[in-house]
């Protein structure tokens, strides 16, 4: 017996290329073999002339906002990330896609002469974070951050027994009244260290950024040239730039002194 949930139906139009870019980023977050069906889905929210796309694997949350879309009816749903990505990929560039939440379990996509029906799951089941990250914020240039990540990620360890080496150690240090954001990684055979000079002192607790987060962040930064807002609280970190937000859990452990 199918359970129905009552939610305002949703109807909107969106540019294919913007949606494809957003869904493409989501592919790196979604776990292909998740035991929870909802984690194979993307959350789609149409509200205030914007479309918000969210993907998570519980350790990593990625959100992208597509602004200035035509919304006939606001609403939200979740649908398979892999299937919607595959469909949008095959739709010609420059097209407009119409979305219509026909009922609580069916999202209809229409573009040119093609029509597709996607299965949906209740958006209220989608796990979201509600932490307040408004402390310890600082800005850093995206190109500089990508540079230090690329210089250090080659030394990340794959040894699962030493989880504290399965990422990049990020910390702020001071030298001759100058402050640097320093990245370090080691697999115990080799070590890579790179640093960025900061404009002023920042409050930033030392963290170990997980490997998956690093790969996702690298792909997001590749086509960016702007300031990124970084803030961390307890066991999580948030990167905010343009219309994208990446929130990640951190590796719990102590990076070796070097």
Language-model regions, residue ranges each:
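Structural preference for solvent-exposed beta-strand-turn elements
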Residues: 2-258
